[in-house]
Amino acid sequence: MIKNYFFNDKFYKDLIRKKKDPRIINEYKKILKYKKMIKFVYQNKPMGTGDAVLKTKKFIKDKYFLMLLPDDLIINKNCSKSMINVHKKFNSSVMASMRVDRATVSRWGIYKLSKKITKTDYLINDVIEKPSVKKAPSNKAVIGRYILPKTIFKKLKSQTAGKGGEIHITDAIQ
């Protein structure tokens, strides 16, 4: 479905022809600009985010990479840009977070925070995947934006399945 959104040239050409809307033309031009940079990988069966990330290894060339999970909708134009700026400043991994109600922590990966380093940034000691309310170290939840080092692939490759029989990216981050 996502692949069709980006690569369905016939759809966009028909839409442009029918609507003649400059916004649609501009959107299509943006997609064309990035089309060669976008790669898709598929999991034959759902084995967790760690397994999905492992399948991208051959495409990762830089020391760090930005990972966006499509099931977390973040309505903020600058989330990835802000994360990249933090990464450049501290030369480290960066993970987005959001505050969640303590009663719902068992639905999320939860950060164990070490130290507040700026108004919005923390050092992270650990990530606990879907802890009980009693065992949750904070109410800062993992959301689908990460800047991770290429070395994560080595950890993922040797990792055994965690909760639900899946390979979790959060387990490899620890």
State the predicted function of each range:
Residues 9:
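A glycine-rich beta-to-alpha transition motif near the start of alpha/beta enzyme domains, typified by
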